[in-house]
């Protein structure tokens, strides 16, 4: 049975709480690093022309979906008994390597190839007889598309002046993404998307210097630039109701150098 948007309100609230927690975590780590190490770390990662590392990451991702004009115009009758099509945020994780080229003390070029494990969830809500908020009469079908993605981000990293054993940074760039699953296999899913994309990525984080390594947490926002929708093989009940699908994600990275 369909609920009255309680599920989606929970996701919205959860996102705000998660972001606030991450920001507090960043500040707490920075304070801990400075309090524990009175002397400035001499690890020297920032002085090397080329440096390397690895990272672990957790993300929440979804589709950005745009309805077609036919669905927005009730006179066409194409919508049938479908009330709404709602992408839902879902969690995943990724891991990869860091390759960093030093351009200046405050500017780096980063290549960070990674493998990501994604799940894209979409709810299709159908209309029913008039019900109540507690016992709605409509129904919901959930479509899940799992994907393993290879991502090749190329980013600029601008760093603030170092203060003791920490410094803030910003990242900006793009990423080429391709799905490891064949398109023929993806065509059997209810809501079908293509497997290649280019994303625009923006992030913010802190470098924290320890005695033998550098730890850098970062929050990064990613927005897909291509329309991934493939209506030819999508479920015919709603394939004409969608005009555009793009990926977006929010990722927490934990970098180690």
Enumerate the predicted regions with their spans.
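Cleavable N-terminal export/targeting peptides
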Residues: 1-46
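Residues that define the transmembrane beta-barrel architecture of outer-membrane proteins
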Residues: 48-52, 89-93, 146-150, 166, ...
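Flexible, solvent-exposed loop segments that connect beta-strands
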Residues: 66-86, 119-145, 181-193, 229-243
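Outer-membrane beta-barrel channels and translocator barrels
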Residues: 47, 104-106, 161-165, 209-213, ...
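Short glycine/proline- and aromatic-enriched beta-strand/turn motifs that initiate or cap beta-hairpins
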Residues: 32-91, 257
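Residues on the lipid-exposed face of transmembrane beta-strands in outer-membrane beta-barrel proteins
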Residues: 54-58, 93-101, 113-115, 152-158, ...
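Predominantly the C-terminal beta-signal and adjacent terminal strand-loop region
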Residues: 195-197, 205-257
